[in-house]
């Protein structure tokens, strides 16, 4: 009987030790799992596509790690903000990882404005914030009227992106070249006392009023502007201004130099 008790005791001891070993193993396994490093994924994108780059643009990052994320705009564009799992308006930011991150770099198109005086005027009317040769294209697309007279402007480059512009008044400046082909909504144009020689009105068929006094025009073609009401181009170098047949009667009330004629076949 005593032997049996001893055997049972040894067996119970073995079972107890085995349970203890298993318990310790499980505890060790849990601790080990908790202490293993955790990896997270970084994914980035650019909106609109092609407007800029993000660095780094993707990667695997350990829990708690911090990376420096940078957004750089391509020429003609500007960084606006981060969106997605990051909300910030600074192009270079630090990002600490506690989960997977999907980040979007938002950019906007910029319009080149090389004339500092013109850009200063855009700052004055609230569509720009600093003189750097560029203005936010989305902001100027909404402008319907500009009066930039008596400023000493040489160059109106950038005006092509004012696509809803209806009124442009730029008298008494130093403008010698001007492209209005993209300003198809123009109705009133006043460019008195500049240095202009040529203007193409092919795409400005909505014009109703044109003032071009005191320039250096050698010819003009108004024949596509069917709704023109007022016109004046005194003190220029023109011999002939082209009009269409429907404008003949109206042209009698328009102003020109004595040597200049309105004709359908200039």
Question: Where do the language-model regions lie?
Answer:
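Conserved hydrophobic beta-strand positions in leucine-rich repeat
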Residues: 144-148, 168-170, 187-191, 210-212, ...
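Conserved hydrophobic position(s) of the canonical leucine-rich repeat
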Residues: 143, 165, 175, 186, ...
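C-terminal motif of bacterial Sec signal peptides marking the signal peptidase cleavage site
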Residues: 29-32
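Surface-exposed interfaces of beta-sheet-rich extracellular modules
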Residues: 65-93
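Short, solvent-exposed loop/edge segments of extracellular or virion-exposed proteins
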Residues: 43-60, 88, 119-131
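Conserved "repeat-terminator" motif of extracellular CCP/Sushi domains
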Residues: 36-46, 93-109
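N-terminal capping/linker segments that flank leucine-rich repeat
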Residues: 35-40, 106-167, 224-226, 237-266
